[in-house]
């Protein structure tokens, strides 16, 4: 009788093997929604800009004042451009409270313009003329946002 027990157990589990892998409910969307709810701004946009974007801007301005030399000279340019590109993507999702649909669209478009210019600046590392050009476009886009959403305050100098 004991000899037949493994055969009986195998026979009982055989139909389960034909069903394919046991599937779990797809909770990716639910988890993403929950994660989005968890990540709320720590502070207001003014402080976000002051403590994240402004140091990167100042570092870029100093690094591009003269032509950087070698990898060490270009490192602050890469760092600043990368930080500003990635933070502009984050800023795009933080539309000002009370913004109507038109203002929200404008906010996201300017954020995208800053992102594209910062990304181009990052990609131009090693080419001083191209880097200066992309830096200038990026600053123009930052100032467009400050004009539209901060009543013209905080205009950046190239």
Predicted regions span which residues?
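Sequence context surrounding c-type heme c attachment/ligation sites in exported
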Residues: 5-6, 22-158
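N-terminal Sec signal peptide cleavage junction
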Residues: 17-21
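Bacterial N-terminal signal peptides
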Residues: 6-15
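N-terminal hydrophobic targeting signals that begin at the initiator methionine
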Residues: 1-3
